[in-house]
Regions:
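A translation/RNA-centric and nucleic-acid-associated enzymatic feature enriched
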Residues: 161, 171-267, 281-427
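Residue-level recognition of alpha-helix termini/interfacial anchor residues
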Residues: 59, 276-280
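Generic non-transmembrane alpha-helical segments
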Residues: 143-151, 264-275
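Class II aminoacyl-tRNA synthetase-like tRNA-binding/catalytic domains
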Residues: 2-250, 422-423
Length: 427
């Protein structure tokens, strides 16, 4: 039995083959008197492969009635193509129709808006744009693990359901088995003792606190998995569900953290440019004509390092009119970050030493007692892409920060224990 081969493999062939088996979906079908041309895609790459079907193929009359979206199994000969555009084509000897698609198939051969594709999310991976997105995402996911495994980081699976609010913002999705039509009460409040876990539980906003415990046991560790934020914000910077990468480096400070962040971003961009050239070219043509220049900028430049205080001063003196006021003690907005990366420095920037009042409790308090050893990596066209910090390793200081933030100390006893027993600097 002939083994199925993918289009990405066939198009990269070094020589013709007398018999290949291809399976995929019709993108276009052009019929003529004695033969027809079918463009087939199987999702393995952006490119289609052309199949030539002669009229003497057994079920030719059925084949020419097919429309975009139908699925086929094609057996035939891989030949050099005399036409322009691609090196190889297939001359079919037999075709099995696997599945038909009515003429109202929602993805006809034309460009579709993201808004329209969102209404058919179950079919949009078959579109060129979203097929490319998910192939790139797959390659990036592999590269993320490759990067950390090559540097002897341990991959940790942290809990999805948690009783801790890592970020302290309270924007969490609750998890409960209580009957919402008849919620049990105790002293006027919800009685979580009757809930599944016997206390309030939520979907995690971060695996960081958990992965820190492994960092302080196994050395370098990382987590890479789903994260949930109940932020009522309809911007490109906020999502209810996303996958987050959270490395922790033992015996490290903020300088080590910034260095790892730059190395990580440049590694991923390099890997993607090398492995996903065809898909990136699609985005460079139809989505962002400056894409490749932006990626080359990230790869080829050291990241500028700038303290938050200096960044605020630079922005205030820039003469640029911003929608949001720039003042010390306020977080930088996307417009501020993009000004720094796209107009002033014109390359990636790392802003560090942020005011403690706008950052999380676990970040190390600096000697000025006004700022913490936190950093954000900003890149052109996006703004913030990484946030990180040196963690507060001093037991007394961390305990006081928990108190100052009005957190329940009892919820963080285990986290404090990691500083109580053999604490070390980490980031």
């Amino acid at each position: 039995m002939t083994e199925r081969r993918k289009i990405i493999e066939l198009l990269g062939s070094e020589q013709a083959s007398p018999s290949v088996l291809l399976k995929g979906w019709i993108r276009t079908l052009r019929e003529s008197k004695d033969f027809s041309f079918i463009e087939i895609n199987d999702g393995s790459c952006l490119a289609n492969i052309q199949v030539i079907v002669d009229s003497d193929v057994e079920n030719y009359a059925e084949i020419v009635k097919l429309t975009t979206g139908a699925s086929l199994a094609v057996t035939g000969e891989l030949l050099e193509s005399p036409g322009k555009g691609q090196r190889w084509e297939i001359r079919a000897s037999s075709i099995e129709i696997l599945g038909v698609a009515p003429e109202d198939f929602p993805l006809q051969k034309k460009r579709h808006t993201d808004e329209y594709l969102r209404t058919i999310a179950h079919l949009r991976p078959r579109s060129n744009k979203y097929g490319a997105i998910f192939r790139i995402r797959s390659k990036l996911s592999y590269a993320i693990h490759k990067f950390f495994q090559e540097r002897d980081f341990q991959w940790i699976h942290t809990p999805i359901i948690t009783g801790s609010d890592c970020e302290g913002a309270g924007e969490m999705f609750n998890v409960t088995t209580l009957d919402l039509n008849d919620v049990p009460k105790k002293d006027g409040a919800i009685d979580y003792e009757q809930d599944f876990f016997g206390k309030e539980a939520s979907l995690t906003v971060s695996g960081q606190l958990s992965v820190e415990t492994f960092c302080l046991s196994l050395g370098n560790a990382y987590t890479f998995g789903p994260t949930f934020r109940a932020e009522n914000s309809n911007t490109s910077r906020h999502m209810s569900e996303f996958w987050m990468i959270e490395p922790e480096i033992a015996f490290a400070d903020l300088q080590d953290d910034m260095a790892l962040g730059q190395e990580f971003i440049q590694y991923l961009v390099n890997y993607t440019v090398a492995e996903c050239a065809e898909d990136l070219a699609l985005f460079a043509k139809f989505v962002d004509k400056n894409l490749m220049a932006t990626l080359e900028n990230i790869i080829n430049n050291d990241f500028i390092r700038l303290s938050y205080t200096d960044a605020v001063e630079l922005l205030q003196k820039s003469g640029q009119k911003f929608e949001y006021e720039v003042k010390w003690g306020s977080d930088l907005q996307s417009e501020h970050e993009r000004f720094l990366t796209e107009q002033h420095f014109k390359q990636p920037v790392i802003v560090y030493d942020y005011p403690k009042d706008i950052k999380a409790f676990y970040m190390r308090l600096n000697n000025d007692e006004k700022t913490v050893a936190a950093m954000d990596i900003l890149v052109p066209a996006i703004g913030e892409i990484i946030g990180g910090s040196q963690r507060e390793e001093r037991y007394d200081v961390l305990k006081q920060r928990i108190i100052d933030m009005n957190f329940d100390e009892a919820d963080y006893w285990w986290y404090l224990d990691t500083r109580k027993y053999g604490t070390v600097p980490h980031a």
